[in-house]
Design a protein with these regions (language model features):
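Short helix-loop-beta junction
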Residues: 1-10
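Short beta-strand-to-loop elements that line the ligand-binding cleft
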Residues: 11-18
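Detector for C-terminal structural segments
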Residues: 1-2, 22-145
Length: 145
């Protein structure tokens, strides 16, 4: 909040339970459960370009179909998405996705905020912890004394 204020962006937080937030994420900004919010900050894992970009920028992913929470739409983006989805060769698909990414950065429909919530401290009773190199931690290696 303080960092954004330095950029002349004044925000107020409406802190809600995480699952409620996720439910609204699918319902969209027009739903009463959004409480009049003009933005949302939802944690998610982006595992591939389609999961990371397409569901937030395609007019075909408006709620309740998917997670285009703010109903962002741009015909150019839809064209790049269609090109990527129908390209079965790596180079044309990657080129369309790279252009989509560049346009997302240029148009800036989002502010990308990351807060690493990965565990970094454990009780001494927990053994076999392998610190993650990404957002996910493998609990299969762990045990308790």
């Amino acid at each position: 909040q303080q960092s954004l204020k330095q950029c002349h962006i004044d925000i107020q937080f409406d802190v809600i339970e995480w699952n409620t937030l996720f439910t609204n994420w699918r319902k969209g900004s027009k739903d009463p459960s959004a409480n009049g919010a003009q933005a949302t900050n939802v944690s998610f894992a982006a595992m591939d370009p389609f999961f990371a970009m397409v569901r937030f920028t395609s007019t075909k992913t408006f709620p309740p179909v998917s997670n285009n929470w703010g109903y962002f739409g741009n015909p150019e983006f839809d064209g790049l998405i269609a090109s990527a989805r129908t390209s079965f060769e790596d180079k044309p698909r990657d080129a369309a996705l790279a252009k989509l990414h560049a346009r997302i950065v240029e148009e800036a429909p989002f502010i990308w905020i990351a807060h690493d919530v990965g565990p970094r401290a454990m009780s001494q009773k927990v053994k076999g912890v392998v610190q993650p190199r990404s957002w996910f931690i493998d609990i299969a290696t762990m045990s308790m004394d």
